[in-house]
Amino acid sequence: MLAMALIESAIERGGLVARGAFALDEADRRAGLSGVEAIVLVGAAGARGWSAFAASPEARDGRPHPLDRWSRRVIGALATALGARALYPFEGPPYPPFQRWAMRAEPVHVSPLGLLIHPEYGLWHSYRGALAFAEPIAVPVIARRASPCEACSARPCLSACPVGAFGEDGYDVAACAAHLRKAAGRACMDGGCLARRACPVGASQAHRPAQASFHMRAFLSARGAPG
């Protein structure tokens, strides 16, 4: 049985963060993961994971999708070294259910913005891939916690967006993107989503300007607009 500490160490050497693990059941295997015993999620948390990408060739070569290409290279190499299969949230359709996997692997919950909220990192974390193992691993027991959003009556995240893109009906992607394309959207483009930044949980983990701006430009680029 593979030790989780060995897997975590390998992921950290690759510049990323181990984001929890879970053992699969028969329903998972029937859903297309036959032969897989356990999954370890790989991603970023706060600033952890950013510096390795920012120093990579992919970040500077000017080609599309640099973060996805870097994730594929790094996580693919980890999979080869650890005898696992690499899975990615951006490969599909069908796309692997990374949000559901995350809620099995870590004490995260769906926030009012639709993003998963972590008790330490707040909304400042992501999942870049997963390692699927054909043999069992020693999956850590998760200390389950209530969502921090349950005790937040003010919910500043829902009122901070300049164009009200977040509400009871969900996320108005078109309104958000249209705002970012205008001069009035520079605060979001340069410093990151204002609704996300309004959340007090994990505020110290918020992306610094270079990281925030990269992700906002990538968001616009995915919607056919230059960042």
PLM feature spans:
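Non-ligating segments of multi-cofactor redox enzymes
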Residues: M1-G227
